[in-house]
């Protein structure tokens, strides 16, 4: 089973993608994880990508396509792709690769939330500067404000988590996703999921659909 999952900043798509990975034994491919790993390595490419993210801009398609397709070549089948494609140019690159290798996408899941909810979820996020633990000032606050429960490190807000940057990211996402949504609708594999509510509530909107697809595919 091959899945695409996308959603605006703060939609919880990565959390749901990991649940899907565990339940169906898929390989998890996260564009965000791949990009962050490159940035953390402080490579020239990583430093270049960091500049785009700090401004709330999208990383150029040529860079993202190279990173993702390279990962996909090592996986081949039974994957869930988190956060890719996000532009029409990325769709073209992905479709060309899939066509050349005889791979089909079973479903494209879109987890939708409003801009207000996106800002609320993202702007409250805090990251430990030492160990990388993630907190939220509203949903998962540390015991001592500004300090990590695990290692005592200072909690910081990532530059791209600032409210004004989140709003910009949301607007860019929605603008770029419109033609992508239409593309997958025409293919008959697009499914829109309400991303508001708890993690479990959203999961129960996704699980029955994927159980059906998985069981149907297994009987082929």
Swiss-Prot record:
One of its GO terms (molecular function) is ATP binding. GO terms for cellular component: cytoplasm. GO terms for biological process: AMP salvage. It is found in: Cytoplasm. Zn(2+) binds at residues 128, 131, 148, 151. It comes from the Archaea. Catalyzes the reversible transfer of the terminal phosphate group between ATP and AMP. Plays an important role in cellular energy homeostasis and in adenine nucleotide metabolism. Consists of three domains, a large central CORE domain and two small peripheral domains, NMPbind and LID, which undergo movements during catalysis. The LID domain closes over the site of phosphoryl transfer upon ATP binding. Assembling and dissambling the active center during each catalytic cycle provides an effective means to prevent ATP hydrolysis. Some bacteria have evolved a zinc-coordinating structure that stabilizes the LID domain. Monomer. Belongs to the adenylate kinase family. This is Adenylate kinase. The gene is adk.
């Amino acid at each position: 089973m091959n899945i695409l999952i996308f959603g605006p900043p703060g939609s919880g798509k990565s959390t749901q993608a990991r649940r899907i990975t565990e339940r169906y034994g898929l390989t998890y491919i996260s564009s965000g994880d791949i990009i962050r790993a490159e940035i953390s390595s402080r490579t020239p490419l990583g430093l270049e990508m960091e500049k785009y993210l700090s401004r709330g801009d999208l990383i150029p398609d040529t860079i993202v396509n190279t990173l993702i397709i390279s990962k996909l070549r090592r996986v081949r089948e039974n994957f869930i792709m988190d956060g890719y494609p996000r532009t029409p140019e990325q769709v073209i690159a992905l479709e060309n690769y899939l066509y050349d290798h005889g791979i089909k996408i079973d479903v494209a899941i879109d987890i939708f939330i409003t801009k207000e909810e996106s800002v609320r979820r993202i702007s409250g996020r805090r990251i430990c500067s030492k160990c990388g633990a993630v907190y939220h000032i509203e949903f998962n606050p540390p015991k001592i404000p500004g300090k990590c429960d695990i290692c005592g490190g200072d909690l910081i807000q990532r530059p791209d988590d600032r409210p004004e940057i989140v709003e910009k990211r949301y607007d860019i996402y929605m603008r770029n996703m419109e033609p992508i949504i239409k593309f997958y609708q025409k293919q008959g594999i697009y499914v829109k999921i309400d991303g508001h509510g708890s993690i479990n509530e959203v999961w129960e909107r996704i699980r029955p659909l994927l159980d059906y697809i998985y069981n149907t595919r297994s009987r082929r």
